[in-house]
Curated annotation (Swiss-Prot):
Species lineage: Eukaryota, Viridiplantae, Streptophyta, Embryophyta, Tracheophyta
Keyword Protein transport included in the entry's annotation: no
Complexes and interactors: Part of the 50S ribosomal subunit.
Protein name: Large ribosomal subunit protein uL16c
CDD domains noted in UniProt: Ribosomal_L16_L10e
The organism of origin for this protein: Nymphaea alba (White water-lily)
Keywords for this protein: Chloroplast, Plastid, Ribonucleoprotein, Ribosomal protein
NCBIfam families recorded: rplP_bact (TIGR01164)
A biological-process GO annotation: mitochondrial translation
Presence of the UniProt keyword ATP-binding in the record: no
GO molecular function terms noted in the UniProt entry: rRNA binding; structural constituent of ribosome
InterPro entries: Ribosomal_uL16, Ribosomal_uL16_bact-type, Ribosomal_uL16_CS, Ribosomal_uL16_dom, Ribosomal_uL16_sf
Length: 135
């Protein structure tokens, strides 16, 4: 699973997901991509599940680029704990994804293979996505 090697602070505020993504919204490396249509937190497990799904379907052919990285810690307090006594401990990492953000890119395969692989990866995501092709 993806996670930062070290961070400046252990815990973060939740923040808000306003507007669309102006960075990371163009295809840079491959020919085909999966683009987010909704805002969401995507966990490192979901990113890894999507990456595995694409690589399993494509087998040896092609190359995959994961364009998002989980750099936000999400804290949870233990079950059946009373309120108060500080913020919970960091449990997992998420990537803050806004609409139009490219999640995965693929190259070196045919469009039919890429479309099918991205469709499987899209099923692993908690948001609606679309398949895009570089101009």
């Amino acid at each position: 699973m993806l996670s930062p090697k070290r961070t400046r602070f252990r815990k973060q505020h939740r923040g808000r997901m306003k507007g669309v993504s102006y960075r990371g919204n163009r295809i840079c490396f491959g020919r085909y991509a999966l683009q987010a249509l909704e805002p969401a937190w995507i966990t490192s497990r979901q990113i890894e599940a999507g990456r595995r799904a694409i690589s399993r379907y494509a087998r040896r052919g092609g190359k995959i680029w994961v364009r998002i990285f989980p750099d936000k810690p999400v804290t949870l307090r233990p079950a059946e704990t009373r309120m108060g006594s500080g913020k919970g401990s960091p449990e997992y990492w998420v990537s803050v994804v806004k609409p139009d953000r490219i999640l995965y890119e693929m190259g070196g395969v045919s469009e039919t293979v890429a479309r099918a692989a991205m469709e499987i990866a899209a099923r692993k995501m908690p948001i609606r996505t679309k398949f895009v092709i570089a101009e």
